[in-house]
Amino acid sequence: MIQLDGISKVYKIRSGYMKYHDLYALDNISTTFRNNIISGITGASGSGKTTLANIITGYDTDYAGQILYNNSPVRTAGYVRYVFQDPYISMNPVKTVEWHLATAASINNVEMSDAIKKLEIAGMDYSIYKDRYGHSLSGGELQKLALAISIIPEPEFIVLDEAFSMMDSITLFKTLNFLKQLKKTISIIYIDHDINRIAFASDYVYILNHGKIIEENYTDKIMNDPLNDFTKELIKYSPDYHRRI
């Protein structure tokens, strides 16, 4: 369980000569992300989704407030893993898939055979991909590789920040269904700007706007009976894939 207590992130923005004003990327966020569910976070661009992900995973430590991991302020090694938006940054283009797996396995003291299993269940055939270099993989393939690497150490939580944005619709559908199985052993925080993807995969949804969680509830409640006007707008102007099908 991850508990946020009064999390704020403020940037000083210059507004004139020797003048600055505060810009709240996150504004006093207090909530809980529970175990063994998919917690979906969505909202407008610039609403603070990635900033929140950076703080939860420890990549940004310059913030106000407190985070508790299983009721402790200390994040133990391996507790949470982060899958970034851009796999071209996180994956080495001149190293093979096998190298990426072996490196992750070595760092986390995991047998290579177990790392290969993670790649397979993430949807990549090791025998086909092991000798492929990073630069030869598509964006969607790199995103599957990044997902596989994130679960090699079997963390308690993974944070997925727009982690499937380069996948085709078939691969995306399979990956989101994979997450529904994965949550039985690894709790998931899934961030996406598309509320329909969030609704398809998530058990519980958080709506961010201007650095605040303006609404949170179980997915069916959010989609069928939203309370906040911004949430209603998000749903109204999002393509309804179910009706198209």
Predicted feature descriptions by range:
Residues 42-44:
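The feature captures the beta-strand-to-loop junction immediately N-terminal to the Walker
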Residues 64-78:
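Conserved ABC transporter NBD signature motif
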Residues 86, 93-107:
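Q-loop/switch helix immediately C-terminal to the Walker
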Residues 133-137, 141:
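Conserved ABC ATPase signature
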Residues 198-200:
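A short, surface-exposed alpha-helical micro-motif characterized by mixed small hydrophobic
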Residues 223-245:
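C-terminal boundary and immediately downstream tail of ABC-type ATPase nucleotide-binding domains
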